[in-house]
Amino acid sequence: MPTDITIYHNPACGTSRNTLAMIRHAGIEPEIIEYVKNPPSRAVLADLIKQAGLTPRQVLREKEPIAAELGLAGADDDAILDAMMAHPILIQRPLVVSTLGVKLCRPSEEVFDLLPPDRRRPFTKEDGEVVAPRD
């Protein structure tokens, strides 16, 4: 089974770091896109959100101060995507893409669903919590 995985990663985020470590723990070296420095195009982001079965609002980091400054509380999807393009920190992370689908991996153990079944192993997160794949 192919193991191509891409993670839209922010190294400042513990959930993103744990997700990346879980992928590597499965013996897979993913393509890492530090999306704050190298954001995806608007079309790619919109497609990732759609493939994940989410809306732009569900991928918006609403607690970021810039979200309030921009008045995104009542914004439509297009305005949210525009804001994410201008301020990539507004994109919730990590988004992970594999041959098994696309997910916003919050919590990080959501990534188990995107790993080949024979590579899903229990993992100890940064805070010491042990997580395991669902049966």
Where are these regions (language model features)?
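Residue-level preference for short coil/turn positions at secondary-structure junctions
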Residues: M1-T3, I91-Q92
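Local sequence-structure signature of Cys/Sec-based thiol-disulfide redox active-site neighborhoods
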Residues: P2-A26, P30-Y35
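A short alpha-helix capping/helix-coil boundary motif
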Residues: M1, R24-A26, R42, V59-L60
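Thiol/selenol-based redox catalytic cores and closely related redox-interacting motifs
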Residues: Y35-D135
